[in-house]
UniProtKB/Swiss-Prot annotation:
An integral part of the sensory system that mediates food signaling, providing the neural basis for the regulation of food response; coordinates larval foraging and social behavior changes during development. May have a hormonal role in females. Its main location: secreted. The lineage of its organism: Eukaryota, Metazoa, Ecdysozoa, Arthropoda, Hexapoda. It comes from the Eukaryota. GO terms for biological process: digestion; neuropeptide signaling pathway. Belongs to the NPY family. This is Neuropeptide F. It comes from Aedes aegypti. Keywords: Amidation, Cleavage on pair of basic residues, Digestion, Hormone, Neuropeptide, Secreted, Signal. Residues 56-65 have a biased composition (Basic residues).
Length: 90
């Protein structure tokens, strides 16, 4: 009988722990709702504009990362006629 009592207690403890964990997890969802405060909207717009300017400063186009199989198709300089020459190297 001692074995079944401890098994029942551990199941109850496990269920209680699960319920407490779910309650704590569900209580965090209340903070995720958006606010209709105009200052928070203005702050979000300002942060997005700042992010856009930082991205524009640090993002670089990917020139020179493609092969020379078809330079006209990749926007390479068409004046380079020697791209097909086997001795041509960059």
């Amino acid at each position: 009988m001692t074995f079944s009592t401890s098994s029942s207690f551990s199941r109850r403890a496990l269920v209680a722990l699960l319920v407490c964990t779910l309650l704590i997890d569900l209580s965090s969802f209340t903070d995720a709702r958006p606010q209709d405060d105009p200052t928070s909207v203005a702050e979000a717009i300002r942060l997005l504009q700042e992010l856009e300017t930082k991205h524009a400063q640090h993002a670089r186009p990917r020139f020179g990362k493609r092969s020379y199989l078809n330079p006209a198709g990749y926007g390479q300089d068409e004046q380079e006629d020697d791209w097909q020459d086997s001795t041509f190297t960059r």
